[in-house]
C-alpha cells in the first residue's frame, strides 16, 4: 500500500478556491484500488498550503489513473486550478 501526497502552494488567499475544486473533483477521479482520498489545508505549515492525499494498493494503479484522460466532469471541476497555484510537489510513501 502506498500513500500519495500532492502538495500545492497556492497564491495568497486562494487556498479555499483550490480546496473547493478538489472536493468537487475527487469523487469524479476515483479509480479501483484508490481509497481514503482527502483534502487538507495547513495549520502550521507554509501559508496557503493545500494537500490532496490518497492511498493506493500499488503505484501502477496511481500512474494508470494519471495516464487516462479525465472525465469531462472532472476536467470542468478542475478548470483553471493552475491559476490558483504557485507550485508544489508530490510525495509517495510506502505504508508499512
Name the predicted role of every residue range.
Residues 1-2, 96:
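Absolute protein N-terminus
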Residues 3-8:
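Active-site-flanking beta-strand signature of metal-NTP-handling nucleotidyl enzymes
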Residues 9, 53-55:
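Short hydrophobic/aromatic beta-strand micro-patches
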Residues 9-20:
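Short, surface-exposed ligand-recognition loops at beta-strand->loop->(often short) alpha-helix junctions
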Residues 12-14, 58-60, 96:
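Residues that cap or initiate secondary-structure elements
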Residues 20, 24-38, 55-92:
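An amphipathic, aromatic/His-enriched active-site/gating alpha helix that lines ligand/cofactor pockets
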Residues 40-42:
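Short beta-strand micro-motifs enriched in acidic
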Residues 44-48:
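Short acidic/glycine-enriched loop/turn segments that link adjacent beta-strands
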Amino acid at each position: 500500500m502506498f500513500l500519495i501526497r500532492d502538495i500545492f502552494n497556492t497564491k495568497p488567499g486562494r487556498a479555499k478556491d483550490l480546496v473547493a475544486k478538489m472536493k468537487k473533483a475527487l469523487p469524479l477521479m476515483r479509480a479501483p484500488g484508490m481509497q481514503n482520498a482527502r483534502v487538507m489545508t495547513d495549520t502550521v505549515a507554509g501559508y496557503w498550503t493545500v494537500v490532496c492525499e490518497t492511498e493506493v494498493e500499488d503505484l501502477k494503479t496511481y500512474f494508470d489513473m494519471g495516464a487516462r484522460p479525465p472525465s469531462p466532469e472532472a476536467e470542468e471541476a478542475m478548470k483553471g486550478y493552475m491559476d490558483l497555484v504557485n507550485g508544489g510537489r508530490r510525495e509517495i510513501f510506502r505504508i508499512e
